[in-house]
Amino acid sequence: MALTDISHPTDIAMLTDLYELTMAQGLWESGKANEQGCFTAFYRDHPFGSAYAVMCGTAELPELVENLRFTPEDIDYLASLQAPAGGAMFKPAFLDYLRNFRAHVNIDAVPEGELVFPREPMVRVTGPSLECQLLETALLNICLLYTSDAAD
């Protein structure tokens, strides 16, 4: 399924977990949002007992980066979240940052259809640390899901 098949492709930003968003706010608050960041995607064990997997999902990655936006509804939802100690979980200035968020990262990936093996990098993302943080969960979900399905 291409990301363009999703009825609302801008909703991709919320295909994450709260950890990624709170870490992004921490990077933003500490002034480290634009420091160089990098993460790699790999799998630990052979999916479904096979000796290898077939890389899938890399064709979707540029679209993922391009469509990573926070809708007004996303911002309203995030603004409604309460911190465990009380008060707003996300600062209004950080939510303003997310309103205009655009990712500018570099992605290096094993080509679509190539064999991949456990503990070997399949994808490497480099760029501003906050942008990498917000892309991590969605990217891992796409690549690892497609690749594990191809191994089945």
Residue ranges and their predicted role:
Residues 1-148:
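Ordered alpha/beta subdomains of enzyme catalytic regions
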